[in-house]
Curated annotation (Swiss-Prot):
Keyword entries, A-Z: Amidation, Cleavage on pair of basic residues, Neuropeptide, Secreted, Signal
Gene Ontology biological process: neuropeptide signaling pathway
Gene: flp-24
Main subcellular localisation: secreted
Lineage, top ranks: Eukaryota, Metazoa, Ecdysozoa, Nematoda, Chromadorea
Name of the protein in question: FMRFamide-like neuropeptides 24
Function according to Swiss-Prot or TrEMBL: Probable FMRFamide-like neuropeptides. Plays a role in behaviors associated with a sleep-like state induced by stress (SIS), acting in concert with the FMRFamide related peptide flp-13 and neuropeptide-like protein nlp-8.
Propeptide: 26-51, 68-69
Signal peptide positions (record): 1-25
Organism: Caenorhabditis elegans
Length: 69
């Protein structure tokens, strides 16, 4: 069994490692190209791949034969 002192030292070290990991993640430098609004939605290497549009509710009703009453 670990003594109380040893377990508290391990806990303190784990907390310090977690704080350092969070601080390191927050300091990541991004390229200027990645800060464009388009970068939030797709990666640059995808290029201009034509994406399917999402069908509207009206399109789905026509497709499945639903009629308004």
């Amino acid at each position: 069994m670990l003594s109380s002192r040893t377990s508290s030292i391990i806990l303190i070290l784990a907390i310090l490692v977690a704080i350092m990991a969070v601080a390191q993640c927050r300091n990541i430098q991004y390229d200027v190209e990645e800060m464009t609004p388009e970068a939030a939605f797709r990666y640059a290497q995808w290029g201009e791949i034509p994406h399917k549009r999402v069908p509207s509710a009206g399109d789905m009703m026509v497709r499945f034969g639903k009629r308004s009453i």
